[in-house]
Structure formats: C-alpha cells, structure tokens
Curated annotation (Swiss-Prot):
Descriptive protein name: Acetyl-coenzyme A carboxylase carboxyl transferase subunit alpha
Cellular location(s): Cytoplasm
The reaction(s) this protein catalyses: N(6)-carboxybiotinyl-L-lysyl-[protein] + acetyl-CoA = N(6)-biotinyl-L-lysyl-[protein] + malonyl-CoA
PANTHER family: ACETYL-COENZYME A CARBOXYLASE CARBOXYL TRANSFERASE SUBUNIT ALPHA, ACETYL-COENZYME A CARBOXYLASE CARBOXYL TRANSFERASE SUBUNIT ALPHA, CHLOROPLASTIC
A Pfam entry, by short name: ACCA
Organismal lineage: Bacteria, Pseudomonadati, Campylobacterota, Epsilonproteobacteria, Campylobacterales
An individual GO BP term: malonyl-CoA biosynthetic process
Family recorded in the similarity comment: Belongs to the AccA family.
Length: 310
C-alpha cells in the first residue's frame, strides 16, 4: 500500500477514485482519471519547496542502499567486520560488478520494517561501522578497485558506547584517509546526508545527490531546537539551512544532481536505480581516463577549496 505525504493529498484522492472506478468496472472513468492524475502529479511536483524535499528524502518507501546494490551489482558478495570490535550492520560493504566494471560499494543502510530498522540501528553507524568502511576502502586501494559510497543516514550514532569507542576519531580518520586514498571514488547521497555520519563516507572524487535527497550539518529539527528552542519550526530551519541538492549544487559543495523520476524515487524505484547506475558508469569512465595521481591531486584540491572564497 502506497504511503502519501501531506502535499500529495490531491494525488491520493485521484488514486482512490481510480481504485473505486476499477471496482465498478468503469474503464471510461479510469481513463479520464488517469489523465487527471498525470496533471495533478505534474502540478504537485513541479515546484517542491525545501521542506517537501526533506519529506521525500525521508519517505519510508524510498529505495535504500541495499535496493540499489541488489539491482545494480552483479555477482555481489558482502564483506563483514572491522577486525577490531564487531560487524556494524548500519554499514554494508559489497564487491561485485556494475556494467562489467569491478567495484566495491560501501553504504549506509537504514532497514525497512521495525525488526530491520532496529538491526540496522536506523542507519546510524557506530565507530566500528566507519572502521569497517575504512578497512574495505584500504582493500579497494590495494587491488585498485573503484569505490562507490552510498550515503543515507540521519547521522552517526550518538550513544555513550559509541563515544567511548571513539566515534569522533573514527569519522575524522575516514576524512583524513579517504582524502588521499589511491583509488577512484564516487559518493552519492541517496536519501538523508546527516552531518558527520554522512561525511565519514562522503569524501570522494565525485560527490552527487539524488534530486530529492538532503545533506546538512544537523537535522532541521535539531537546528530549530537550538536556534528557537522549538523543534516544530523545522520547516523554517529547512529553508534557511540550504540542504537540498539544488541548493548545494549552487553553493558548489557538490558536483552533480541526479534527476529522479517525476514522482520521486519512492514511486518509481526502477527509474531511480537506472539513473544512479548510469551516473556511476559515466563517472567511472571519466575517472578511469585520468592517472590515479592526478585523480588524488584533484580530490585534495577540491576538498581544500571548500569554504574558500576569492
């Protein structure tokens, strides 16, 4: 059963009308309603505001990392563990082939349904998750395998145990190591890009965002609570924070925006998967034409240019 957001009420009403017309066997009404549905979809999604895009980024039906991995990766094999503490299910690592190219995918996985959300810790990695990512990234470097990072997290887990095991050090270590990693890297925000939890696997030669994803230093609710002592002002915070793909592209903080199907990735998963796959292959082709030393040099220069203004 489809889930509808508040701004999709008009779409829901027409969907319900179509379902009722089908029950009555009124094919003429169904045809008319489908045309009306197309118009309503175009009107609704033509000019989404920042808060509506935030809701789309968090939509429960939106494809998660494993949806993309299982669809795009051929002969995929999961690699587990940080070899120091434990295997963190919030970070998943796979080796396989995309379009005939061998790659390693390192991704944040939220989990679908109560059981798996708890197992994946709602996509909030512990330090051992980031250390697993670093271990696998070093493996990719050793065998000269490109890395695809898929970012989708509310943020790094802020629990006492995570802090005791060095959460901030694990994130900082990844930022340092990934900036000089001698292999080609592509990072894509597929849903939520929450603060350091996203940055920890977000240092790459290409940083892109799906059209309806977000990337921010803090959640809008957290921002509103700090600035106005009122988390309910999250809509105003969302607008002020410039967290959408288009905003960040304009600010030159990301390289590319990957277009989604008209109604978003949650309504057309196959279309979103196809768009991501095509983007990855295109960027890999471009990066493979360059010497790896030049690739790393360009990556470092890009990182150092962030926040620098003439």
């Amino acid at each position: 059963m489809a889930s509808y957001l508040d701004f999709e009420k008009g779409i829901k009403q027409i969907d319900d009308d179509i379902a009722n017309a089908k029950i009555r066997g009124d094919e003429h009404a169904v045809e008319i309603l489908r045309k009306n549905l197309e118009k309503e979809i175009t009107k609704t999604y033509k000019n989404l505001n920042e808060f509506q895009r935030l809701n789309l980024a968090r939509h429960p039906d939106r494809p998660y990392a494993l949806d993309y991995i299982r669809a795009l990766l051929k002969d995929g094999y999961e690699i587990h563990g940080d070899r120091a503490f434990r295997d963190d299910p919030s970070i998943v690592c796979y080796i396989g082939y995309i379009g005939g190219k061998r790659v390693i995918v390192i991704a944040e996985q939220k989990g679908r349904g109560t059981k798996y959300k708890i197992m994946r810790n709602f996509g909030m990695p512990h330090p051992e998750g980031y250390r697993k990512a670093l271990r696998i990234a070093r493996l990719a470097e050793k065998f000269e395998i490109p890395i695809i990072f898929l970012i989708d997290t509310p943020g790094a887990y802020p629990g006492v145990g995570a802090e005791e095991r060095g959460q901030s050090e694990a994130i900082a270590r990844n930022l340092f190591e990934f900036s000089e990693l001698k292999t080609r890297t592509i990072a894509v925000v597929i849903g939520e890009g929450g603060s350091g939890g996203a940055l920890a696997i977000g240092v790459a030669d290409r940083l892109a965002m799906m059209k309806n994803s977000v990337f921010s230093v803090i959640s809008p609710e957290g921002c509103a609570a700090i600035l106005w002592n009122d988390p309910s002002k999250n809509e105003a915070a969302t607008k002020a924070m410039k967290i959408t793909a288009d905003d960040l592209k304009e600010l030159q903080l990301i390289d590319d925006v990957i277009d989604e199907p008209v109604m978003g990735a949650h309504r057309d998963k196959e279309g979103a998967i196809k768009a991501l796959g095509e983007y990855i292959l295109k960027q890999l082709d471009e990066l493979e034409k360059k010497d790896i030393n030049d690739v790393v040099k360009n990556r470092i220069e890009k990182i150092l240019s962030v926040g620098a203004y003439a």
